[in-house]
């Protein structure tokens, strides 16, 4: 049995502030240790539950945050950027039985600690077929096309509530309770590691591949915080303006949908001006 862990950082133990997840800051150095602890707890739990292989895919920012030297020696880690499926890279090869979303967070326009969808502030909302979408929701639809179930989700309490919509049977672990976008009641790393390890062990039993789900077409709508970003996004083929700050596109598969979304976010990031956004 092989488990894939998609590891993001905003939903990690102790993380509440932008500097906590911004590579190179003193706070990031401190928080990446707690992030690594969360991931390692999931790794150990999956091995406890009978997994033969566990692959961790780094999914935050530069995708070079986890401390490999502190992970269980049995694990493998995919680190670095420019991956075909980004946050869920590795699911497409046909050998993954279940996936865990560790350190996940709520989506743009939602309540939740450091809530966003791909871009920190420039995107104010994303909708998938009319439903407001977090990264978890988008990624769950991608992995469903490969017959892989989401078996574990960790993050703040809002991220766990969000996961009820896209992975109702998955085990959930709230490592902190949302107070505001930049505040939370946090549990200690020792406590969250124990909770995550226990949940991952139980979640291993949910790692049973199912027939691929072909739920298309998928219409993705994106709202930005500035008009010129919507204009920039229309450079991507198939992306059309639907309002002053909104665009939308339709894809037959989520594989195509997520890759188009990546293209949109890449171009929009380059279009942001330092002073006016």
What are these regions (language model features)?
Residues 6-7, 57-58, 99-104, 153-154, ...:
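Short beta-strand segments
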Residues 19-44:
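Short catalytic helix/loop segments, enriched in acidic residues and glycine
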């Amino acid at each position: 049995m092989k488990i894939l862990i998609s590891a993001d950082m905003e939903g990690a133990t102790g993380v509440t502030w932008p500097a906590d997840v911004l590579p190179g800051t003193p706070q990031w150095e401190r928080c990446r240790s707690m992030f690594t602890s969360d991931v390692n707890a999931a790794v150990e739990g999956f091995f406890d539950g009978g997994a033969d292989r566990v692959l961790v895919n780094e999914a935050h920012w530069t995708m070079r945050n986890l401390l490999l030297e502190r992970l269980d020696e049995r694990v493998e880690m995919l680190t670095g950027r420019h991956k075909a499926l980004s946050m869920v890279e590795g699911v497409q090869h046909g050998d993954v039985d279940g996936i865990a979303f560790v350190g996940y967070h709520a989506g743009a326009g939602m309540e939740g600690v450091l809530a966003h969808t791909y871009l920190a502030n420039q995107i104010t909302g994303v909708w998938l077929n009319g439903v407001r979408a977090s990264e978890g929701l988008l990624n769950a639809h991608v992995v469903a096309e490969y017959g892989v179930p989401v078996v574990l989700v960790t993050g703040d309490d809002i991220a766990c509530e969000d996961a009820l919509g896209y992975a109702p049977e998955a085990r959930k672990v709230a490592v902190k309770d949302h107070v505001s976008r930049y505040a939370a009641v946090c549990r200690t790393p020792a406590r969250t590691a124990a909770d995550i390890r226990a949940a991952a062990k139980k979640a291993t039993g949910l790692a049973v591949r199912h027939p691929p789900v072909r739920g298309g077409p998928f219409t993705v709508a994106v709202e930005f915080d500035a008009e010129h970003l919507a204009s920039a996004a229309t450079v991507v083929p198939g992306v059309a303006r639907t309002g002053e700050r909104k665009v939308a596109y339709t894809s037959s598969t989520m594989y195509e949908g997520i890759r188009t979304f990546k293209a949109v976010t890449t171009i929009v990031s380059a279009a942001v001006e330092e002073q006016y956004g």
